[in-house]
Regions:
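Non-catalytic cap/lid and distal C-terminal segments of serine-dependent acyl enzymes
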Residues: 5-273
Length: 273
């Protein structure tokens, strides 16, 4: 696990400024281009699933590290995307290649799985409930593929980082760990309001120092019930040029949290309805 770097913070940004940063920052220019490892992707699939929680058909992405066949029996890292990306974009982001690279560097193998969330958040919105999709349906879809849905972690960036933290707060014990890149949080929001419910859940927290959300993320860091188990802060903006430099550390952290088959508190079909 990469040693975390914890730096000093300034004051928190206002909620309005935060919203503009995370809605548009993923495609904002500046900074280096994303760096993707040379390792080959294993089996990557984008399929369609009918989501009762969302009331629509969604894209369902899965990735297995190269050399691990169909991934049967492997634990799962759930992916919560940000506002400008969707599951069909994940192969082009190199997520399957990052996964193989992590395993080739010695990380215990796991699979990635994600589905289409709402463009602006991962919270219930009337009859459209992407959070319930992640909690109730996504593990069942993974279980049907033969993955070990009793061992789950979650990783998200920007809006998806917010959603990953909120998921862990709403359903304590559902995931073994949370990895959040530049989560779109602000003091006083639902994540800050439920932060004590993260007690006992290892958190990895990363953010670029040039990100408009940096002060908010540092405020969240201070509010957490325990120090982050992984993460850090260095030069970088709210885009994949920065995030791509932290995926390796996040996957190493996630793999370590998922590695023990006997420590999970959730059965393979728990939460599925």
């Amino acid at each position: 696990m990469r040693r975390r770097t914890l730096l000093a913070s300034g004051s928190a940004l206002g909620a309005a400024a935060m919203a503009g940063a995370w809605m548009f920052g993923e495609t904002r220019g500046g900074g280096p281009a994303p760096v993707v490892p040379a390792a080959p992707a294993g089996a990557e699939r984008v399929e369609q699933r009918a989501s009762a929680a969302r009331g629509r058909v969604v894209d369902f992405y899965t990735a297995v590290p190269d050399g691990h066949g169909d991934g049967r029996g492997l634990p799962v890292c759930l992916i919560l995307h940000g506002g400008s990306k969707r599951p069909p974009d994940f192969p082009a982001l190199g997520l399957g290649r990052f996964l193989t690279d992590a395993v080739r560097r010695g990380a215990p193998p796991f699979v990635l799985a994600g589905a289409t969330g709402d463009r602006l958040n991962w919270r219930p919105n009337g009859a459209d409930d992407p959070q319930r999709m992640v909690h109730d349906e996504l593990p069942a879809w993974c279980d049907a593929r033969g993955f070990d849905a009793g061992r789950l972690a979650v990783w998200g960036w920007s809006m998806g980082g917010y959603g990953a933290l909120l998921l862990a707060e709403t359903f304590p014990g559902f995931v073994r760990s949370v990895a959040a890149f530049s989560p779109a949080v602000a003091p006083g929001d639902a994540v800050f309001g439920g932060v004590q419910r993260l007690t006992g859940t290892p958190i990895g927290l990363w953010c670029g120092r040039d990100d408009g959300l940096y002060d908010n993320v540092k405020a969240l860091h201070r509010a957490l019930p325990a120090e982050p188990a992984a993460g850090g802060y260095r030069a970088g903006r709210h885009n994949f040029g920065y995030w791509s430099t932290e995926v390796a550390a996040a996957f190493d952290f996630t793999a370590a949290m998922l590695a023990d088959p006997g420590s999970g508190s959730r059965g393979p079909a728990a939460g599925a309805q």
